């Protein structure tokens, strides 16, 4: 009997979309994909998976199964379901299109890929709601991982948990995904914490078919922790109302066809995170203030993608001209960038059996 082969596909994501801080996310058409080979005969096979990693930032990815995020998350899912080891002889070929540390959900994609990998290797057939629970134990903001798993344009939140469930969900990440020591063996870390059921809830919004996303990514990384570190501990009522009003309008406006540029542009305004991140990204103030639907026909709105430094511009046409203007402003600040015009990934993550007959 031949080895079984499966493909796991996880899209990149952009979170916040202006006023939807820690709430909204969209899945986009760059991806992390895995081809997983599971041998039919395991006698004499290597006990740990072999990892082959290609694509963007592949030089920065550890290939030890006890260090690689994909396999650490997969092992967490397996052990939380009573399976203590990987199936022997597994090969994982990862191909990455998502730049690291640029605000396009690279870590969220890796977490979702790891959860799906664990589900596949354990033959668990977990429902998507349970897969999301496992992902949220690792990546504790729901916007990116929910969009990556479900696809499309989503809004999500973490529900209020009972004291018992809150205790489980608040377990430090170091206990969920421990740093395996060099001498870690098969018996190390066998009893990980169980995620509560139904940690995250979400809804899919509509998305007008005309809208594409232009992602302009500076060639430097911005750690999410650093980008969060500049945010204040509290906000004024005025600023919170500003964001809530715009978020309520934006989630409907992006579904209307044809899109209304003036409505969407104003509705993508934000006072919760972007003003505080201006100093971290040279050129950001000018980009957010000078590109408008009037100056650049086709533009609908512009925002930071996640924590940045990528700029996300939503548009219906004139994509290259919009991207070139953002690139020019970054160039004035001596910042090199790359840009891509992306479609919305409505399907989200999936696993396919690609075994040859």
Curated annotation (Swiss-Prot):
**Per its UniProt record, what Gene3D superfamilies does this chain match?**
3.30.230.10, GHMP kinase, C-terminal domain (3.30.70.890)
Which principal EC class is assigned to this enzyme? transferase
Any GO MF annotation of the entry:
ATP binding
Listed under GO biological process in this entry are: threonine biosynthetic process
A single Pfam family it belongs to is: GHMP_kinases_C
Catalysed reaction equations from the record: L-homoserine + ATP = O-phospho-L-homoserine + ADP + H(+)
Q: In which pathway does it act?
A: Amino-acid biosynthesis; L-threonine biosynthesis; L-threonine from L-aspartate: step 4/5
User: What keywords is this UniProt entry annotated with?
Assistant: Amino-acid biosynthesis, ATP-binding, Kinase, Nucleotide-binding, Threonine biosynthesis, Transferase
How is loss of this gene reflected in the phenotype of the organism? Threonine auxotrophy; the presence of threonine dipeptides (but not threonine amino acids), rescue growth on proline nitrogen source.
UniProt keyword Nucleotide-binding present: yes
Could you tell me the EC number(s) of this protein?
2.7.1.39
Q: Which PANTHER family match?
A: HOMOSERINE KINASE (PTHR20861:SF1), HOMOSERINE/4-DIPHOSPHOCYTIDYL-2-C-METHYL-D-ERYTHRITOL KINASE (PTHR20861)
Give the protein family: Belongs to the GHMP kinase family. Homoserine kinase subfamily.
This chain's function reads: Commits homoserine to the threonine biosynthesis pathway by catalyzing its O-phosphorylation.
Q: What is this protein called?
A: Homoserine kinase
């Amino acid at each position: 009997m031949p080895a079984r082969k499966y493909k796991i596909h996880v899209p990149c994501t952009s979170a916040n979309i202006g006023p939807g801080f820690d709430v909204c996310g969209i899945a986009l058409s760059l991806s992390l994909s895995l081809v997983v080979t599971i041998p039919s005969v395991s006698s004499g096979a290597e006990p740990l998976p072999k990892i082959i990693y290609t694509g963007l930032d592949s030089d920065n990815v550890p290939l030890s199964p006890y260090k690689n995020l994909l396999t650490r998350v997969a092992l967490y899912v397996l052990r939380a379901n009573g399976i203590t080891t990987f199936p022997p002889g597994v090969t994982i070929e990862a191909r990455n299109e998502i730049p690291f540390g640029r605000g396009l959900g690279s870590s969220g994609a890796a977490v979702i890929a790891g959860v799906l990998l664990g589900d596949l290797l354990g033959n668990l057939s977990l429902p998507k709601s349970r897969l999301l629970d496992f992902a949220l134990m690792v990546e504790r903001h729901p916007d990116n991982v929910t969009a990556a798993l479900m696809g499309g344009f989503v809004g999500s939140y973490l529900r209020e948990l009972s004291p018992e469930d809150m205790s489980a969900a608040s377990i430090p990440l170091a206990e969920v995904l421990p740093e395996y020591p060099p001498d870690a063996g098969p018996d190390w870390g066998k009893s990980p914490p169980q995620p509560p059921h139904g940690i995250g809830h979400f809804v899919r919004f509509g998305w007008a078919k005309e809208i594409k996303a232009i992602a302009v990514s500076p060639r430097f990384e911005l750690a999410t922790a650093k980008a969060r570190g500049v945010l204040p501990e509290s906000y004024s009522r005025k600023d919170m109302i500003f964001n809530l009003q715009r978020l309520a309008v934006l989630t409907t406006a992006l579904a209307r066809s044809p899109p209304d540029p003036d409505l969407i542009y104003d509705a993508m305004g934000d006072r919760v995170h972007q003003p505080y991140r201006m100093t971290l990204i040279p050129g950001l103030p000018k980009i957010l203030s000078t590109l408008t639907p009037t100056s650049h026909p086709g533009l609908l709105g512009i925002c930071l993608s996640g924590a940045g430094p990528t700029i996300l511009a939503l548009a219906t046409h004139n994509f290259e001209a919009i991207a070139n203007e953002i690139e020019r402003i970054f160039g004035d600040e001596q910042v090199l960038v790359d840009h891509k015009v992306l479609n919305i990934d409505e399907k989200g993550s999936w696993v396919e059996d690609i075994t040859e007959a």
